[in-house]
Amino acid sequence: MADYQDKNVVIIGLGLTGLSCVDFFLARGVTPRVMDTRVTPPGLDKLPQEVERHVGGLNDEWLLAADLIVASPGIALAHPSLSAAASAGVEIVGDIELFCREAQAPIVAITGSNGKSTVTTLVGEMAKAAGVNVGVGGNIGLPALMLLDADRELYVLELSSFQLETTSSLQAAAATVLNVTEDHMDRYPFGLQQYRAAKLRVYEKAKVCVVNADDALTMPVRGADERCVSFGVNMGDYHLNRQQGETWLRVKGEKVLNVKEMKLSGQHNYTNALAALALADAVGLPRASSLKALTTFTGLAHRFQLALEHNGVRWINDSKATNVGSTEAALNGLHVDGTLHLLLGGDGKSADFSPLTRYLTGDRIRLYCFGRDGAQLAALRPEIAQQTETMEEAMRLLAPRVQPGDMVLLSPACASLDQFKNFEQRGDVFTRLAKELG
C-alpha cells in the first residue's frame, strides 16, 4: 500500500475514471487537483466542491509543481506538458498503477488489439460460475479503482496499451496479449513495434503468460519461456480440433467442449474461448464451472451481434470493429449463402486498410463506405463500392437490394468519433435502421 500523505497530486482527465481517482485520494485524506482539456468534461458536475479544477486545457504550472500526476489514458505521454513534467522528475502514473499498488487478490490481466472485452467478460463469468467473489473492469465497464474491495478473491482486468504505458507495479497471476494488429497508429509514431512494446508490458512480472500461437507478436520479447501457455486455431496447448464436421475445444490433446454447445459463434470467438479457458485454468478456477460458463455466455453488444433476421436476411452489428484487425476477424471464415453487403467507414486512425483486400474478392460482396475515410476504403475495390457521406445513407441505399440469403454486416474497421459519440451509438443507430429497413 502506497502512502500519498502530503503529496501534491494532479489528475488529468475527468469522466468516470478521473472521478474514481478523485475518490481514491479523498478517501486517503489527500485532496487532488483536476484538469481536463475539455471545457465541460463528463463528471464535472459530480466533482466535490473542495477539489480545484482547471478545464479547457492543461495547467503547466500545476503539473510542474506536482509530486504525482495521474494521467488519463486519453492523453499521450508524449504530450509536451507531460514530457516537461517527466523531465522535471515528476512521477506520472495511471489509475491502473494506483490499483495495482493496493490490490490484495490475484489479478488476471488481458490486453490485445481485438477480443479483449469478450475474453475479460468470459473469465469473469467463469469465476462467477465457480462462486468466486470477482471484480471485472478496467478498460471495460467499471474503472479498476471502483472494484477495490477487501473481500475480493480475484480481479479480471481489461487493459489498453495506453493504460499499460503508465503501469509498473502489475504482477498478474495470469496475463495475455490476445493479438497485435495495427490500431491507434496516430498515438504510436514509431509504428507497430512501439504499440506492441506497450502491450507486452503486461507480461513483465506475470506468473503465467498466455500467448497466441498464431501471432508471433504476442510472444514476450525474449521469446516464450516456462511461464508461457499457448492457444491457437490449430497449434498451441489450447486449440481447435475439427473432426467429421464437428469443432471441439481441445486442451493438450483432450477434447473438452463441442462448440455447438456454445452460444458464441465464429472462429474468432472460439479462440477467445480458448484464451479465457487458459487464463481461468492458470488461476485455478475449476474446469467444470469454466466450461459451464462457455455454454451460457451469449457475447457482448456490438460485437458481431445479430441485430435482425427477417425475410432470410441477417443484419449483423459489429460496430466494435474499430480497427482493421477486428474487421479481418469478422470476415475470416465468414459463411454467407447470398451476397455480403459490408458497411465500412469512419475515422481510420491512420491505419493501413490493405489487409482487408484479400476478403473483398469474388462477385458476392458489395461495399458501402462512409465517413471520414470512406474514399480510402472504397478504393480497396472501387468496382463493387459505393461511397456515401453517412452510414444511414449507405443503409438506405443497400436496403432495396438485399435478397433472402444475404447478410448486411456493419464491421467498419474504423473509429466512430467522426460522426458518432462512440461505437455503441453507431451500433444502436445501425440496429434501429435495420429494424426500420429490414
Curated annotation (Swiss-Prot):
Q: What class of enzyme is it?
A: ligase
GO BP terms, alphabetized = cell division; cell wall organization; peptidoglycan biosynthetic process; regulation of cell shape
The enzyme's E.C. designation: 6.3.2.9
- Could you say which residues bind ATP here? 112-118
Where is it chiefly localized?
A: cytoplasm
Q: Name any one GO molecular function.
A: ATP binding
Q: Which GO terms describe its cellular component?
A: cytoplasm
Q: What is this protein called?
A: UDP-N-acetylmuramoylalanine--D-glutamate ligase
Task: Identify the species of origin.
Answer: Salmonella typhimurium (strain LT2 / SGSC1412 / ATCC 700720)
- Upper lineage: Bacteria, Pseudomonadati, Pseudomonadota, Gammaproteobacteria, Enterobacterales
